[in-house]
């Protein structure tokens, strides 16, 4: 599983129809975090950007959901077109449809926080500590 990097998560997700369904939202965000951000190969098959190979049991283990909860959440995401799942006897291929809409290539659009806008964030050790001093 990827341990570095980040994903973009637009605030419009707050208005998404599945946002209030914790299991479905959790699975979708987990897939956004774990699908390939660039094409890879796995055991002789091409796994494209926005895809990953996993089983329902693996996703359940990674998310803390039960297999039944993952299956139900996946059905929600498939029904509304966010995710496609192709199952074989050996693996499952999960695809976040329209991945580039969620995670565009290149630099994000819009204003950027931090020094480019004249705002300097706190560096390491500069956050307010428990002693009340900066």
Q: Which residue stretches match the model-derived regions?
A:
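An N-terminal low-complexity regulatory-tail signal and nearby short nucleic-acid-interaction modules
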Residues: 1-17, 33, 37, 47, ...
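Charged low-complexity intrinsically disordered patches
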Residues: 98-134
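Residue-level marker of intrinsically disordered, low-complexity segments enriched
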Residues: 5, 11, 93-94, 117
């Amino acid at each position: 599983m990827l341990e570095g990097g980040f994903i973009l998560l637009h605030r419009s997700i707050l208005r998404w129809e599945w946002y209030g369904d914790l299991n479905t939202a959790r699975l979708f965000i987990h897939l956004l975090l774990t699908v390939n951000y660039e094409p890879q190969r796995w055991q002789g098959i091409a796994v494209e950007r926005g895809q990953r190979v996993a089983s329902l049991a693996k996703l359940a283990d990674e998310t803390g959901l039960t297999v039944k909860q993952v299956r139900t959440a996946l059905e929600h995401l498939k029904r509304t077109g966010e995710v496609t799942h192709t199952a074989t006897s050996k693996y499952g291929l999960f695809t976040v449809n329209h991945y580039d809409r969620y995670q565009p290539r290149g630099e994000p659009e819009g204003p950027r926080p931090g020094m480019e806008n004249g705002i300097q964030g706190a560096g390491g050790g500069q956050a307010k500590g428990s002693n009340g001093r900066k």
